[in-house]
Amino acid sequence: MDEKQRYDAGMQVRRAVLGDAHVDRCLEKLNDFNGEFQEMITRHACGD
């Protein structure tokens, strides 16, 4: 599984667990400080 596939799978799990509204709010608040962390959480905590 490549990084994009892992991210996509993680996003599906993240949305199923946390709900679309919460995930959408998090994505709207992405910035230089938290962007890489949010991506890492989505790929590794939810996608693996």
UniProtKB/Swiss-Prot annotation:
Positions in coiled-coil regions: none
GO biological process, any: catabolic process
Disulfide-linked positions: none
This protein's pathway: Aromatic compound metabolism; beta-ketoadipate pathway; 5-oxo-4,5-dihydro-2-furylacetate from 3-carboxy-cis,cis-muconate: step 2/2
Catalytic activity, as annotated: (R)-2-(carboxymethyl)-5-oxo-2,5-dihydro-2-furoate + H(+) = (4,5-dihydro-5-oxofuran-2-yl)-acetate + CO2
GO terms, molecular function: 4-carboxymuconolactone decarboxylase activity
EC number: 4.1.1.44
Top enzyme class: lyase
SUPFAM superfamilies named in the record: AhpD-like
Keywords: Aromatic hydrocarbons catabolism, Decarboxylase, Lyase
Protein family: Belongs to the carboxymuconolactone decarboxylase family.
Protein name according to UniProt: 4-carboxymuconolactone decarboxylase
Annotated organism of origin: Pseudomonas putida
